[in-house]
């Protein structure tokens, strides 16, 4: 009689024997082989550069199916979330797991408003920085400095201290971003106006002046709120994984978030929307037209890259991209702006979607393709695009840090390596 393999285990044959590993069932998506005992059973390690095939953790926060173009926050489809919620409501959902009651959301909003002010000494921190400093460098430095004002309230094992730190981050990080913008412009910092909503307050801090009242544009507020929602989480990306890895050392949440900001600063992660805008401007300035540019991309001409298409996870149309495109149309129509870059983007998207070269390679527009056009129309310079991404991603970083911090199974991150250096050798006695 032939033995039937246990369907809940995976069997590995290797020189010297076999080993079995349990298969963990996912609620949705791919099941996972648990290799926690791999080294003990086999004497080997695994190599997976870029963690393409490796689940580093269990998480209940966000689900992505890249083949089907699905993104869900705590089970809710992103299309429903973006059209029916607000940034702060989604932040609560991600951090605490369920939608807040009306009373919980009101209290959450109120606590954040009451913590928007920065210590006056921290405001002077900006005086030591050059006006040319990149806002992301300013942001990561300021978040690290922010923790020094709460030295007695950083215990990662004290739930009350953790919750207060979460509120402070949500309240103060957007203010720091706005002040980095004002620093670059050489304009005076405004104090937050806590009578305004989260998004309206942020827009006023960026574009208001001491000389006159700031006029709220509800279309811009709605569009920015949606963009922030769409960026709130994307499961185990590079910056989120960085936050979790740093947090695994029991570093406080300020230090962990600062590390995530630095990871986001990398051009392969947070700088894609700025690169898209530069590409569109390059097409415009060349005078050669979109089709000529597309042919250059297909011919792999030196220095020509198609930005804003394709994604490490999505092998179909990024579900966030459709929602961003809607917002782009609404913002430019509201402002009465005719931006040739948006026209170029639309033409480029249509050509690419109809071209087998791009379709066969699963190169579809991603969330970054239209965001830069919107931010530019709002008045943000391109160097502010990644800090805006950081504001959006902050609740996701917090949610993952908190999930890992509350999980008794969390271990300090310490990957193995495949050593490929010199073998043992003797130190020369005479040189």
PLM region spans:
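Non-transmembrane, aqueous-exposed alpha-helical and coiled segments at domain scale
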Residues: 2-431
